[in-house]
Design a protein with these regions (language model features):
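Glycine-rich phosphate-binding loop of actin/hexokinase-like ATP-binding domains
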Residues: 118, 123-176, 260-265, 269, ...
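Short glycine-aspartate micro-motif
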Residues: 4-8, 55-57, 93, 126-130, ...
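Short, flexible, glycine-rich and Lys/Arg-enriched loop motifs at helix boundaries
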Residues: 68-74, 103-122, 252-278
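ATP-binding/phosphotransfer module of carbohydrate and carboxylate kinases, centering on a glycine-rich
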Residues: 1-49, 164-305
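Short beta-strand scaffold segments in enzyme catalytic cores
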Residues: 6, 14-18, 62, 128-130, ...
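Glycine-rich beta-strand-to-loop/alpha-helix junction loops that act as flexible
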Residues: 58-63, 130-133, 238-248
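ATP-dependent carbohydrate kinase catalytic cores
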Residues: 92-121, 206-211, 218
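Short beta-strand-loop/turn "lid" adjacent to the catalytic site in phosphate-handling enzymes
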Residues: 49-94, 103-110, 252-253
């Protein structure tokens, strides 16, 4: 029986899985830590050898332009037609990673979404955002139309959010993901203390006597709430805002939800406050969002190959 190979290349790992039959689940899910992915063809050869794979859906962290993606955080480029021709796939689809996450919504049960704030749906717009190695985001309109963004590399909000960390010097922090990502947590902690720790270690120190860890995480939480508040109004996300990624799943366990909602509302004027009050905010608790999104995308396009 032929299979589809699903691959997600993020800033740190390559994750993969297979699916076949009615394409309802992921099989043999695994990951490869990446220090360099210049040998991607070799990796792909190993993943398809004697596996009866005839189709590939691959999501990559970077903007898709004319069928190609060049990663923003790595020296790596990929073209879907080149891959299809080289490996003789029946079909090959290349997605931006957040395009893939937008397609993942249909895979979730209600138990897969932890609710920070309930809401009332008033249109078909869903907004996804996730601070990880960088900061990704996408808009889902209805169930099929996903518009990935490069919000993490914009600069308009950075200076305002630096105030949440009591940083006046913006020279080291220019883009939104410089102040709102896992890397940002590490960079800001190091900027404040001179000590380099992983974002995971800093999150684990939250609530301890490490005052700077507490301060940085509090600043991060406020920055996230203020950012999604602006995104909610920018995209009128009447179907909800969904925050994804392992980092936010960890922070969700320790953060003050009521304070987060207070930051989300901010000092918006009445009519805009009323919009925010209707918007649901959820945390995607299901792992492998991109792989699920890749599979859902494939199922939608299986008869179009």
């Amino acid at each position: 029986m032929s299979k589809v190979l699903l691959i997600d290349i993020g800033g740190t790992n390559l994750r993969y899985a297979y699916s076949d039959g009615n394409y309802s689940s992921l099989n043999d899910t695994n990951k490869i830590q990446l220090s360099c992915i210049k040998g991607f063809d070799e990796i792909l050869t190993n993943l398809t050898k004697e596996k009866d794979v005839d189709s590939l859906v691959i999501s990559v962290a970077g903007p898709k332009i004319n069928g190609s993606i060049t990663m923003t955080n790595r020296d790596f480029s990929i073209n879907e037609q080149d891959i299809k021709n080289t490996f003789k796939f029946k079909s090959c689809h290349l997605l931006n990673d957040w395009e893939s996450i937008g397609h993942s919504l249909a895979a979730y049960e209600s138990s897969d979404i932890a609710i920070i704030k309930d809401g009332t749906e008033f249109n078909d717009n869903s907004f996804f955002i996730g601070p990880g190695t960088g900061l990704g985001a996408a808009l889902l309109i209805g169930d099929d139309n996903v518009i990935p963004t490069e919000i993490g590399n914009t600069t308009g909000l950075t200076k305002a959010l630096l105030k949440n960390y009591a940083i006046d010097n913006a020279d080291h922090f220019r883009t939104l993901e410089d102040v709102l990502s896992g890397k940002a947590i590490s960079d800001i902690y190091e900027y404040k203390t001179g000590q380099r720790l992983s974002s995971e270690d800093i999150v684990q120190r939250y609530g301890s006597d490490d005052e700077m860890a507490n301060y940085v995480i509090d600043g991060f939480i406020k920055s996230l709430a203020e950012t999604i508040s602006d995104m909610a109004l920018t995209f009128i996300a009447g179907r909800g805002i969904y925050i994804a990624g392992g980092l936010i799943r960890s922070i969700f366990q320790i953060m003050d939800k009521e304070k987060f909602i207070e930051y989300f509302y901010g000092d918006k004027k009445l009519v805009h406050l009323q919009i925010l009050e209707m918007i649901k905010i959820g945390i995607v608790e299901k792992e492998h969002a991109c792989l699920h999104g890749n599979l859902n995308f494939y199922k939608k396009h299986i008869n179009k190959a």
